């Protein structure tokens, strides 16, 4: 089953005209949030993962290119790059080993390869914030994992420090993680190997400890 959170016109603020222009943009990326839970799991804890934006790489669609964050809906996308594989393995471990419900979304809802969205970021910021707040209310996460600075900034007025610590932000529990596309030296600040896969293994352990576990941790 799928559910869509409508955005009333009044919530658009001064972005209505800009959004209408996007529909005719030759290269417009939009990712549908993904809500996942392992079949048969009852009353799971909830983890919300907030990433950056619906990036489109070498994909001139000529129109709206609709997908999901990190292409998670597609087995092909889940395996085509180290960045996707790392994030998808992290999510799959949350679903299988922690048996939590995962909601995967972007803080910046639109992407264009030109400067259209960035040049109007001041106007879009309010709209993106409104939608993210609606998602927070609908999903009611026990823990939020942000990926990168944009996502951390969207959750808190004062950016949480990236690393492996769960912090309390506006009555929400937040783990501000590095983005999967971050430079290796960022990961090396936390794990000796500097490998993003090892870093996200550590992130998983923190989430596992914070939320508790029904089975055995590998």
What do the predicted segments below correspond to?
Residues 164-199:
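Short, flexible loop segments at boundaries between secondary-structure elements
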Residues 204-218:
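A charged, well-structured terminal subsegment
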Residues 133, 137, 201-204, 208:
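Amphipathic, non-transmembrane alpha-helical secondary structure
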Residues 102, 198-199, 203:
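Intrinsically disordered, low-complexity N-terminal regions enriched in serine/proline/glycine
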Residues 1-159, 173-183:
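A polyanion-binding, active-site-adjacent surface
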Residues 8-15, 192-196, 200:
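Intrinsic-disorder-associated interaction segments
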């Amino acid at each position: 089953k799928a559910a869509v959170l409508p955005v009333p016109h009044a919530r658009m603020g001064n972005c209505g005209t800009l959004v209408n222009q996007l529909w005719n943009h030759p290269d417009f990326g939009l990712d549908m949030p993904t809500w996942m839970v392992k079949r048969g799991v009852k009353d799971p804890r909830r983890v919300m993962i907030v990433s950056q934006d619906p990036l489109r790489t070498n994909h001139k669609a000529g129109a709206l290119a609709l997908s999901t964050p990190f292409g998670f809906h597609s087995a092909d996308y889940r395996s085509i790059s180290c960045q996707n594989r790392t994030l998808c393995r992290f999510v799959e471990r949350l679903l299988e080993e922690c048996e939590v419900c995962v909601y995967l979304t972007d803080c910046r809802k639109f992407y264009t390869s030109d400067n259209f969205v960035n040049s109007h970021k001041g106007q879009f910021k309010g709209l993106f914030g409104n939608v993210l707040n609606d998602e927070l209310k609908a999903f009611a996460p026990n823990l939020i994992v942000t990926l990168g600075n944009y996502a951390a900034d969207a959750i808190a007025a004062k950016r949480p420090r990236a690393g492996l610590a769960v912090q309390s932000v506006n009555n929400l529990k937040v783990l501000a993680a590095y983005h999967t596309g971050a430079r290796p030296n960022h990961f090396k600040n936390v794990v000796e190997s500097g490998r993003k896969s090892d870093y996200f293994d550590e992130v998983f352990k923190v989430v596992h400890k914070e939320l508790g576990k029904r089975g055995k941790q590998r």
